[in-house]
A protein has these predicted regions:
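Active-site-proximal loop/turn and secondary-structure-junction residues that shape catalytic pockets
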Residues: 98, 243-245, 253, 292-294, ...
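Extracellular "leader-to-stem" segments immediately downstream of a signal peptide or signal-anchor
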Residues: 2-115, 119-227, 250-258, 418-420, ...
Length: 478
């Protein structure tokens, strides 16, 4: 970097830092007492009438499209009817019947207090006919200049407090399967539309958007639970939790190819009291992305999780409403493009503070750590400037090389981060560590990285040391 330099070092009191750290740990994070969920009793058990081969062949949907019969031959109506008539505190259960192990559905809607349970060995498939999801005729399954809301989600959870999705089965959005258009199998998949939108965006300033459905979209719903379910191949985001208080995600699996664009795993936004724990996530975008575009996101615990391919544990890019009180602990990131990431820019920035990462292992990532306040900045409008302060990295171990960067927006809008035990387990020489418009504090744990950059300070001392190894953290994807 032109003009890059090593920072001057000044010391701070380790005791003072320890007190501040302990105080921060007592507050924030999910304020609820979160326990392992319990599957509620069934109000009705629906038996499968389809094999997996029949559900994914597309034949049922092409016949229905040609006949103009809509979703009559799908499972949409009977699942929805069961959800509508189930008492609160109970579940609609999807079960195997002989060799039949699949359900095929268009958009469905959860109801307050009602849980959808997908039994072991059962897969609930999302239909491939874009007409079923269209908000208005022709609005879904295309690339257009609209905002990206042309499709209903596969599962809508709106004003449905106390609802959930559970079970040892799977929900498959068929994002990589060819769409059904006018009674024929088309040449495009949901994921192809995302690529088409990106290609079109390279030719113009205002990029068009793919109009594709999310898998699970919640809004104005408190105390929502995802438990043990496997989510696969969403056309877009797998789980969006918006304007809610109380989200529990426990023991789920998200499994989607790394090439599937915009397939975030879990995106909490404008919400509070969130726990995501004991889960395995790999997808084509952020494994988790904490957002705060229209309001604050606060009090969140991410614990005992394993991430694989994807764009890592992210905050942003929408941070206008403020993000605070976040605790991320016992996390392994094995081969992601990015590891730990805070991203925003001057069109959508805000204050990100009181975020603690603890006991983190990252290997084989191009960018193990990136806190960037100029992320994908389009160069228009500078009235929502991002500031990151009170960020702590504790017991973070990286291996495999890559970039570690802290980039504040300017001299007045900085990144403030404490590195309390941050080690390259191989060699610091394998990493390009940079800090610009940033204030770094080292200690009391060891830090063996050497940072260069501009307009930045370091309080503390770079020292070699030891932290627990990561071998046991990296487990195969289930």
């Amino acid at each position: 970097m032109s003009g890059s330099k090593r920072f001057a070092v000044c010391r701070i009191s380790a005791a003072s830092l320890a007190v501040a750290t302990a105080t921060a740990s007592l507050y924030a994070q999910d304020t609820r007492t979160v326990k392992e969920p319990v599957v509620p009793p069934a109000c009705i058990i629906l038996k499968s009438t389809l094999t997996t081969a029949g559900a994914i062949s597309g034949e049922m949907e092409t016949r229905a499209s040609k006949a103009g019969s809509g979703q009559a031959s799908l499972d949409t109506a009977r699942i929805q009817q069961a959800l509508d008539h189930c008492d609160k505190g109970h579940a609609v259960e999807l079960d195997i019947e002989g060799s039949n192990d699949a359900f095929l559905t268009g958009p469905i809607f959860l109801r307050p207090g009602v849980t959808l349970v997908v039994d072991k060995g059962v897969t609930l498939y999302g239909a491939r006919n874009a007409e079923y999801y269209a908000v208005k005729p022709g609005s879904c399954g295309i690339v257009s200049d609209d905002s990206g809301n042309g499709c209903k989600p596969l599962i809508t959870v709106k004003s449905a407090t106390g609802s959930g999705i559970m079970g040892d089965g799977a929900i498959d959005g068929q994002g990589g399967a060819k769409l059904i258009v006018d009674g024929k199998v088309s040449s495009k998949t949901w994921w192809d539309l995302a690529e088409d939108a990106r290609d079109a965006g390279k030719l113009r300033d205002d990029a068009p958007r793919q109009q594709v459905p999310r898998m699970i979209d919640t809004d104005l719903t408190d105390d929502f639970t995802l438990y043990r379910i496997t989510l696969k191949n969403s056309p877009n985001l797998h789980v969006a939790f918006h304007r809610g208080d109380g989200l529990t995600v426990w023991g789920i699996t998200i499994d989607t190819p790394k090439t599937a664009r915009n397939t975030d795993g879990i995106d909490p936004a404008q919400s509070s009291n969130i726990t995501i724990t004991r889960s395995w996530i790999r997808d084509g975008d952020d494994n988790i992305a904490i957002k705060a575009g229209d309001g604050p996101t606060t009090n969140m615990t991410v614990s005992h999780n394993h991430f694989y391919w994807g764009h890592g544990m992210s905050i942003g890019s929408e941070t206008t409403g403020g993000v605070s009180g976040i605790r991320i602990q016992d996390l392994s990131l094995d081969g992601p493009d990015n590891g730990l990431r805070i991203k925003s820019n001057a069109t959508r920035g805000g204050l990100v503070e009181d975020v603690i990462y603890d006991d983190i292992c990252i290997r084989d990532s191009k960018i193990p750590i990136l806190f960037d306040s100029d992320y994908s900045f389009p160069g228009k409008g500078v009235n929502q400037l991002p500031v990151y302060s009170g960020i702590e990295l504790r017991n973070v171990r990286v291996s495999g090389g890559g970039k570690i960067q802290f980039n504040g927006f300017d001299h007045s809008h900085r990144v403030g981060v404490t590195l309390d035990g941050v080690l390259a387990l191989d060699s610091p020489a394998h990493y390009k560590a940079q800090a610009n418009h940033s204030d770094l504090t080292f200690g009391p744990g060891p830090v063996n990285l050497v940072f260069i950059g501009d307009d930045s300070t370091v309080n503390g001392k770079q020292v070699n040391g030891k932290l627990p190894g990561c071998a046991a953290k990296f487990v195969p994807f289930p």
